[in-house]
Each structure stands twice: as structure tokens, then as C-alpha cells.
Amino acid sequence: MEKKPFVTLDQVKKMAASYPTPFHLYDEKGIRENARKLKAAFAWNPNFHEYFAVKATPNPYIMDILKSEGIGADCSSYTELLMSDAVGLKGHDIMFSSNVTPAEDFKKAAELGAIINFDDVSLVDFYEEIGAPFLETMCCRYNPGGNFTLHNEIMDTPKDAKYGMTKEQMKEAFTKLKAHGVKHFGIHAFLASNTVALGYYPKLARILFELAVELSKEVGVHIAFVNLSGGVGIAYRPDQEPNDIMAIGAAVKEAYDEVLVPAGMDDVAIFTELGRFMLAPYGCLVAKVLHEKHIWKDYVGLDACAANLMRPAMYGAYHHITVLGKENEPCDHMYDVTGGLCENNDKFAIDRMLPKIDIGDYVVIHDTGAHGFSMGYNYNGKLRSAELLLKEDGTVKQIRRAETPQDYFATLDYPGLKDEK
């Protein structure tokens, strides 16, 4: 799959005249088209609902776009709940899935009428102790343990994950919730991250559908929905094939028809909590080349760093890089593409073949629309970059300004720092 930026050099030059690099840029047209494609893939399920994983891109302007496409919010913290409330999401348009949950988070989620997803059976008792109200619809998170395999390949290791409950704990939690007057129940699980295998969702769905039938019979509860959570990934590398969400939706339907329908449970809704799939390809980090260095290797240094995009430094993750204006030139130079942090892992690419790069060139680092800005930080006194939205009509809107030194010092009460520009 060829990786092409959704923005041109001329567009970036115009943006940079008003909003200096580095900045994260999002493509409204791509976001909307992808949201509609996801909904089409699950249109066979009348009550299908996507809850965007706010942690992936916590910006209310992005959430507003998704809300207008009928998409809710998957929240895991108090501040994410506040953001969802601010954009007008309430009630069953919010899923609250957290772990090690503070009392105030549970209370806020209940106040908003969100669907609360309990990560552990002990949290049901904790919820009662803090005096939070039990709602008609509540959910529990399942962890089957062991290894999660697909086509004899280990995709992830739920046995090592801190999330979710065992099957027996699910039964105990459902029994407790039923005693508290809960009438409708949901089952949730997340068993693998960033999968590009078409079989992930269908296999997960089958596991959860079978559990739903078992819990419905043994505990005597109404299973209202199965939440497949996230885990559907994207093709970060040009040689990867992107996920076919239409094929995934069809395969989930096949499992639904084979497991739930014969059990008389054809009213079960399908929920998803996609973050990366929804946003990553429709965001990029735009940066400018500041310096080049030639010692034992050839380096190009950008005005962006790992504080703007942590994934390569933290995970060794691949992000494709395009040198704007040189898309058709041969990639015959090998570079390490770096930022300016005092850390040797502050590298966006290592031994990457690219066109000859010159100081002043603009580069696009692809697929940063999820877990890009949101994982930013202030190490080395670096400041978080702006976020811009390329609107459908071609205009650009700043949806978050860049931080200033004054922002960095805002929580310090120390003479001489408050007024730094």
C-alpha cells in the first residue's frame, strides 16, 4: 500500500506561515469517510454503536466531528468524562471503562448516565460503598487468561494483562449487579492490540458470544450488548495491507448468527471502542528540518521530537516519513531522523532510506492521528505542539494552540517565572 500524505507542500507552507511547525494535522474528510465505512460494516446490527477511544486523540473538536457521525465516547478518566460532557455526550453515548478507579470517577460517570464497565469484581462492592447509584444497564470486563492465538500465532497474552475478570468472577459480578437492580448487562473484552489480521474481531466476538449465552443461562440476566472494544489496527508500513472493515463486520455477523441467534439472543447489540482505526491514518505530524549531521551515520534533526510523538522512542514503532516536494525522488540516502531531546532513543526513524534531505525541508510523519499528540510530554522542558484541522472545504482551523513557556511554568509559584513568554 502506497503511503501518500493528505496534505501538499504548498498547503503546509501556507499553514506554517500562521502556525509554526511542528504541529499535528488532522484530515476531517478522511475521518468522516472512515466513520461512515465502519457504521456500514456493522449496519446488519440495528443497535451497533462505536465509542471512540478518547485516550487516542483527546480533543473536543475531533469528538464533535465524530459525534455528528453518530459516534460516542469511550472514557477511562474523570477528565475524559468532562470532555465528553462538554461536547454534549451523555447517557448511553458514553462508555466508561477504567481500572484502579477512583470514587470521583465512578460518581461522575454515573451522574452522566454513562454505561459503566467494571474491570474487577471487587469494584462492584467499592461502587456500593461510595454510594454511587446502580444504573439499569452496566457492564463487566472479561479476561479469559492464557494466550490469545489466531491461526496458531500468539497475538497477545491476556494471562499477563491487568485488565478484566475470570469467568467465575464475571458470574459473581453479574449476580451482585442483578441483586442491586441492574436489568441489562454488557460484556467487554480487549485481547490484542493493533491487529492487522482480519480474524481478530471475529474470534473475539465468538468468545464473547459464547460467554454471553452461558452467563444469560446460568445467572439469568439479559445480555444487552457485547463490546468488542478496540484492537483493530492500521497498516503503519507501506508493505502492509490495511484492515478490510467490511470483511471484518461480515465475519462478526457470521459468528453472531451461529452463536447468538440460535440461543434466542438476536437482540444483542454490538459495540466497538476503536481509537487507532478511527483516527491514526487521518493525522500526521508536520515538522521542519533544522540541522543535519554527518559522523558515523548521517542524521537529520527536526524541530519535532519524541515529546511530540512518543511511539517510535517508546515502542520502536514504525511511522512512515514523506519529504514534502520530494515524493517522486529516489530514496537513495540513509538517515536517522531525530529530534532534539537529550535521549538517544529520540529517533523517528533509524537507517531509513529517504530522498536527499536539505535543511528547511518539510516532512510529514504519517499515522499520528491516534496516540500521537495524546502521548506528548514535557521532558527536557519541551512544549507540546499545536493541533490543526484540515477541514472538508480545504480551510485550516487551529483546534489546540501550541504550549508556551508560560504554560509550562503555570503550576509553579516561583518569582520570575510566571511572566516568561
For each feature predicted by the language model, list its residue ranges:
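Conserved, mostly hydrophobic/aromatic
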Residues: 31, 55, 77, 109, ...
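A charged N-terminal "starter" segment
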Residues: 1-136, 171, 177-179, 183, ...
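Flexible loop/turn segments at secondary-structure boundaries
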Residues: 58-61, 83, 102, 125, ...
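Charged (often Lys/Glu-rich) extended helix/loop segments that serve as interaction or gating elements
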Residues: 260, 265-421
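Structured core elements
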Residues: 72, 95, 117, 139-141, ...
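Glycine-rich, aromatic-flanked loop segments that form ligand/cofactor-binding clefts
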Residues: 132-147
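Active-site loop/helix belt of alpha/beta enzymes
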Residues: 144-290
